Amino acid sequence: MPPSAHWGKRPRSGDSEEAFVRFSELSPAAKMERRREERGEKKERERTLAYFKSVQRALEEHGSGGGDAGALASIVDGFFSELLKLLKADSTFYVLRNGTACRVIELALTSALLLHVKSLLYVFLGHICDLMVSPVASFTLETLLAALSQGLSALGETNPEGLVAELTEGGVGTHVGSGVPSSATLVRSMADELCERAEDLIVHDIGGRALRSVVMMLGGRAIRQAPQPPHPVAFPDVLGTLAEAIMKALEDGYGREYNTANAAESWMAAVQAPATSLVVQSLLRVSDEGSVVDRCVRQRIEALSYKGKPLLHHLLVDPLGCHVFQSYVQVPPPAAVVEAGDMAAARATAAASPSVSSAAKASANEASTAEEFKGKEEGELLVPGGADSCCWSRAAELVLLEVDNLLKPGSDLVAQTGYVLQDLVLYAPATLHLQWLWRRLLSPRLLLLFDVPALTAVLVQAVKRCAFEGVLLRPTGLAAQLRDAAGSDAVSTATAAAEAQNEVSHHGTVLPADVLSMLRKEAALHVRYSPVPIAFQSAVCARVCELAKQRAAKGAAQYLLVDGALSEKGHEVARYLMHLHPSASKLLQHSLDKLQREDLVAVVCHQKGSQFMQQYIKVAALATPTSAATAGDNAGDAKGPLMRLFRRLQSSLSTLIYDKYAAFMVETLYECASLGVKEALVKALVPIYQDMRKLSPSAGVAGAPAASEDGVEHAPQEPATAEEGEAAGNAEVASPSPTQQRFIAYKVMSRCCVEQYVHRKEDWTKLALRQCQVQQLLRRMLLSE
């Protein structure tokens, strides 16, 4: 481990030249002088700490909106001036041993200018390794690197020439008169210090964590849970130098420590140490094709063999080495592999008919799609493009050969194999690879995915990967299109809602807030949802529903939502199946009609069951003809899925409107339904509303909670976005109080415009008709995107 003799024990000036003398052996005058010095140092430390605390209060006050930007900039600038003076005057950096001082520096770095960040890093040079192993200062160094990355990203947006100057090693950067060199020069000097002590850092718990942050920052990735910069800035040359030093330290250090016979044994010893293993995983995550990191880490792993088998095989079957294998799976594939896979998927989609209506046509399309990547590989176990095409292909082929041994009864490797399979699903380079993985690995072992709880998450990820295929995580053009389409009040309201909520559409429906948040987090981890043909989506849904029907007489809905065989994962599988293309999830939609009414009510009153039902209502509304949506007495509307759902739940409405989960479903039903279903629902709610008025005459829809209270219990606009709030409310174990239940019920009445229907029916009809027209306009626009 790195020596820490000078860290935590401040050497006094002249200690190295003077012989050690006990305090008791000093003369009375020397004792008085020593005590006077200690009192002075203590007072100085107290004054310094008081200054840091005052800066902290000022920064927190301005951070909460209590001051203007100019005052905040002045505070930060003055603080860094004092901090740099303090650090330059004390070569031991004694102040950085205080946790409060370090937290204040981290807080100031969030509002610091690029010059402040560079100046602080410039002062740190020469002490980087000591800071890396410090329990508190290491976090400050990580925050400093994150601020440097954010500052360079912002500079690239406003001043591209300045960014080029900052990335020039040996240059002066953009701050010519400051005496601080360019960012690339500072980062290179920092990396040189780390290379000298790499052998010590990779085995140090704190130093290893800080070293991972350095690796991620040099690779252009976010660290310390900071948001990913819009224009990441990487230092590939510096990263390559550091990676070479780390790999040399790994093989030499562990080889010397364990007296290993070859480099492969050193690797196997290294992956048993969590600190070293995590550093290797970080290097794999920032490995790009053709880079130095790719050559010295990824290619090195592939080239080594141990006991007659590839090193990758031993990493797969090792409980700790499996984590390195997962990071190997996540290595970004070459652009050529991704492009070829997308082109094959595009050809399959173009060959398919616009509407997949018959099972025979779906099977034919699936067969033709499979034929594209089977070809000469028929009867072989080769992955698309061959095992050498990318890391994912090599790992998938190895897993296919070993999966039966890994998943055999009594194996201790089932759980870790489940995590590997999840990564294979999520990080499949293209649809071509995902189809191969489903056909060769997952579909033949679907029984295991159903029966083994540790593997059920693999099924969830596979369905999710198909459901959100090709999703674009950007605001839809909904608001702009609506603004140009018409100028009515209803359209203006919809436009404002779309702009405020930053919605994203997929398969004709707006993605719920919790799903959108999940997808954004996965996108930050470089998970790519490539386009998936509808035929393949249909095949996945049919296979899951077929197996579920064998276990439940009433079909997949009964097995996934009611029987609880898959626990909470069953609701997730069902919900993601409902996010497939509407024509691909027909089997699950039809199985919902077979549920008993009591079971359907139980599903609606469950949190994840309510989320599933909300998505089902949105999908079912897509099948409603335009004429039926605006005609209250249309004969076809009476046989529609939403009317059937309403009739089955009509007798339970007096209970459902008081349930915090079922209430969202009722609101979604009113919002998405056609005019006939809207009126039938409101008519059923009128007697309940009148009874509520009789029980509490002073209460009413006008007494519904305000917007601030609304945000706690329900989302103010789209019911689907309320799922994010419900996830937070799920922590409450106790059932809602009577006051909360009345709040929920009046919220439902308000959203369904029951009071308006009672007193001004003509106005309600006009409003409902306008809502139906807007819904149809929204669906057409979403489907056209």
State where each predicted segment sits.
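Eukaryotic gene-expression regulator signature that favors modular helical reader/repeat domains
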Residues: 2-785
